[in-house]
C-alpha cells in the first residue's frame, strides 16, 4: 500500500489526471478499474477519478509494492545526467526564480541530447533540496519565457504551479515589461518607436522585416533609447512592445543598425573584425530588466510593479 498526500503543486487538478502522471506506465482502464474496486481511494472513500483535488487530500493505493513500482517506472529520475553548473540566480522565492542566462545556452531543449537552462534549474532545485525528485512525476517546474541561444539575460521560471501559471499568463498577454540592452553598428541619437511587419521562414529559422503587411506577416513595434555612443557604435536600451522571434535583432538590422556580434542578421565584416580583435562570439544583446504588471495576480501580487 502507498499513501499520497496532495501538495499545493498538485491541488486543483482531477484525480484521474494526477494518477495518470504518477503511474504513467499504467493504462487508464487499469486506473479506473482500481478506483471502481476501491483499490484506489480518496480521503478514505470510493472515487471515480473526476474529483477535483485539494491540498492535503489523501490518496491511498491498495496495491502491491511491485505493482506500484511497475507502473511508476520504478522511481522518478532526475531530469538530466551529467554536470550542470548552478544557475546564476538573480531572485528566488517559493513561487519563482529569475535567472541570468548566459549566451550560448539554450533556454529549453530542442533535441533530447541538448543542454538547456531549464534542465539546469531542475537539477538545482533537486540538488539544493527545494524539490524532492519524486515530485517530478506530478509537477515539473519550467521556464516561462525564452531567449535565443546567443542572447543573455533574465529568464523567469515557475517553482510552484501557481507561480508558473501566473507568470505564463503575464508573458502571454504581454503585461510584463521587458527591457534589453544592446550595442549596434552606427550612431543613433534619439529615442524612437519603430514599427513594421515580421514574417518568419520556418525552414531557415530566420525572419524578414517589411514596412507594409505581407502574407503571413505579423505587426511588430520596437522602442529604443540611445544610452551611449563611441567608436562607431551605440549602446541602446530596447523595449519590446510586441515580442516576436528574433524581433530586436532583425528590426534593428532592417534600419541599418545591426547588433554587434549577430552573425545571422548583422554586418559580417564588422563581426569578423570584433571576433578577431576581442574574441566576440555572440551578439551583444542582453535582457537586463523585467517589470511586473501593477495588477499581478495572487499569489504573486507581492511582486506587483517590481
Feature names for model-found ranges:
Residues 43, 108, 158, 210, ...:
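Thr-Gly-centered strand-to-loop micro-motif
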Residues 1-33, 65, 82-87, 206-208, ...:
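Pseudouridine synthases involved in rRNA/tRNA modification
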Residues 1-202, 215, 229, 299:
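RNA pseudouridine synthases
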Amino acid at each position: 500500500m502507498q499513501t499520497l498526500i496532495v501538495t499545493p503543486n498538485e491541488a486543483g487538478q482531477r484525480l484521474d489526471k494526477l494518477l495518470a502522471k504518477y503511474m504513467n506506465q499504467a493504462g487508464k482502464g487499469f486506473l479506473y478499474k482500481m478506483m471502481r474496486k476501491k483499490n484506489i481511494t480518496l480521503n478514505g472513500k470510493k472515487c471515480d477519478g473526476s474529483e477535483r483535488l485539494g491540498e492535503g487530500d489523501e490518496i491511498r493505493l491498495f496495491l502491491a509494492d511491485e505493482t506500484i513500482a511497475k507502473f511508476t517506472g520504478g522511481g522518478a529520475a532526475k531530469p538530466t545526467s551529467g554536470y550542470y553548473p548552478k544557475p546564476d540566480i538573480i531572485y528566488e522565492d517559493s513561487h519563482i526564480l529569475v535567472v541570468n542566462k548566459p549566451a550560448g545556452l539554450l533556454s529549453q531543449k530542442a533535441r533530447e541530447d541538448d543542454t538547456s537552462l531549464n534542465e539546469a534549474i531542475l537539477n538545482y532545485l533537486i540538488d539544493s533540496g527545494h524539490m524532492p525528485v519524486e515530485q517530478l512525476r506530478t509537477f515539473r517546474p519550467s521556464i516561462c519565457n525564452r531567449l535565443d541561444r546567443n542572447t543573455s539575460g533574465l529568464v523567469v521560471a515557475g517553482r510552484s504551479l501557481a507561480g508558473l501559471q501566473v507568470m505564463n499568463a503575464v508573458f502571454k498577454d504581454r503585461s510584463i515589461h521587458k527591457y534589453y540592452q544592446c550595442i549596434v553598428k552606427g550612431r543613433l541619437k534619439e529615442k524612437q518607436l519603430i514599427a513594421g511587419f515580421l514574417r518568419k521562414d520556418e525552414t531557415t529559422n530566420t525572419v524578414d522585416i517589411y514596412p507594409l503587411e505581407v502574407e503571413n506577416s505579423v505587426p511588430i513595434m520596437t522602442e529604443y533609447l540611445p544610452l551611449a555612443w563611441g567608436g562607431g557604435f551605440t549602446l541602446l536600451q530596447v523595449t519590446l512592445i510586441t515580442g516576436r522571434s528574433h524581433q530586436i535583432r532583425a528590426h534593428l538590422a532592417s534600419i541599418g543598425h545591426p547588433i554587434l556580434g549577430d552573425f545571422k542578421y548583422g554586418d559580417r565584416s564588422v563581426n569578423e573584425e570584433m571576433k578577431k580583435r576581442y574574441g566576440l562570439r555572440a551578439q551583444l544583446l542582453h535582457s537586463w530588466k523585467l517589470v511586473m504588471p501593477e495588477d499581478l495576480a495572487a499569489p504573486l501580487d507581492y511582486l506587483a510593479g517590481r
